[in-house]
């Protein structure tokens, strides 16, 4: 299993 990647930054 691949390590969960960081969530994408939420635009303003």
UniProtKB/Swiss-Prot annotation:
Its main location: secreted. It is found in: Secreted. Keywords: Hypotensive agent, Metalloenzyme inhibitor, Metalloprotease inhibitor, Protease inhibitor, Pyrrolidone carboxylic acid, Secreted, Toxin. One of its GO terms (biological process) is regulation of blood pressure. The keyword Secreted applies. Expressed by the venom gland. The modification Pyrrolidone carboxylic acid is found at residue 1. GO terms for molecular function: peptidase inhibitor activity; toxin activity. One of its GO terms (cellular component) is extracellular region. Belongs to the bradykinin-potentiating peptide family. This peptide both inhibits the activity of the angiotensin-converting enzyme (ACE) and enhances the action of bradykinin by inhibiting the peptidases that inactivate it. It acts as an indirect hypotensive agent. This is Bradykinin-potentiating peptide 12a. It comes from Bothrops atrox.
